[in-house]
């Protein structure tokens, strides 16, 4: 796995597994809301009244509605914050 995805995948997986409502802001300013149904290397499947496939390159920010733990013994991501707080040993 690429070093750049060592935080992205656990974060998205925690949001998916816990069904945390998220706001996803796109690079063009559009705000999408829903829960993450699935994701892969290139897309996120967002579910609200319908499922939407959103390309990751179009995503600017993912904001969870509540705090989410990232990884076992890892830090957390605060809701409404652009700051990720994680253990120092996970960051190079």
Curated annotation (Swiss-Prot):
<comment type="function">
    <text>RNA chaperone that binds small regulatory RNA (sRNAs) and mRNAs to facilitate mRNA translational regulation in response to envelope stress, environmental stress and changes in metabolite concentrations. Also binds with high specificity to tRNAs.</text>
</comment>
<dbReference type="GO" id="GO:0003723">
    <property type="term" value="F:RNA binding"/>
</dbReference>
<keyword id="KW-0694">RNA-binding</keyword>
<dbReference type="InterPro" id="IPR010920">
    <property type="entry name" value="LSM_dom_sf"/>
</dbReference>
<feature type="domain" description="Sm">
    <location>
        <begin position="9"/>
        <end position="68"/>
    </location>
</feature>
<comment type="subunit">
    <text>Homohexamer.</text>
</comment>
<keyword id="KW-0346">Stress response</keyword>
<dbReference type="InterPro" id="IPR047575">
    <property type="entry name" value="Sm"/>
</dbReference>
<comment type="similarity">
    <text>Belongs to the Hfq family.</text>
</comment>
<dbReference type="GO" id="GO:0006355">
    <property type="term" value="P:regulation of DNA-templated transcription"/>
</dbReference>
<protein>
    <recommendedName>
        <fullName>RNA-binding protein Hfq</fullName>
    </recommendedName>
</protein>
<dbReference type="Pfam" id="PF17209">
    <property type="entry name" value="Hfq"/>
</dbReference>
<dbReference type="InterPro" id="IPR005001">
    <property type="entry name" value="Hfq"/>
</dbReference>
<dbReference type="GO" id="GO:0045974">
    <property type="term" value="P:regulation of translation, ncRNA-mediated"/>
</dbReference>
<dbReference type="GO" id="GO:0005829">
    <property type="term" value="C:cytosol"/>
</dbReference>
<dbReference type="GO" id="GO:0043487">
    <property type="term" value="P:regulation of RNA stability"/>
</dbReference>
